[in-house]
Amino acid sequence: VIAYRGGLGMGKTAFTRGLARGLDCRDRVTSPTFTIVNEYQGRIPLFHFDMYRLPDADALFDIGWEDYLDRGGVCAVEWSENVAEALPTDTVWVDLRRLEGEDNGRRITITGVTGF
């Protein structure tokens, strides 16, 4: 699981596009804001989630979250703050922040397990 933290327009979907490219996913990556999850096939599956509209972590189980975890792909989670308590302990966290004084600059901090 890769969990993004950052406000609107910080580049969460853009980061996922790069991830998809690295996994050789051929489909165009779009934000799953209204669908909750988009699936992409590549060397391994990529499941792109947008948790913005979920009321709480309990709603994850209504969308089959555990099934996605068991499918052996990468789960990229936008708005992970809304469901943080339900994410696995080995989640990789990607914090995206705007660089002060720059419209398009970002500081990206990646934390979590090592050796992935």
What function would you assign to each model-found segment?
Residues 1-3:
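Short hydrophobic/aromatic beta-strand immediately N-terminal to the Walker A/P-loop
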Residues 12:
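Conserved lysine of the Walker
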Residues 25:
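Alpha-helical phosphate/pyrophosphate-handling elements in metalloenzyme active cores
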Residues 21, 58-116:
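Short phosphate-coordinating micro-motif centered on Lys-Gly-acidic
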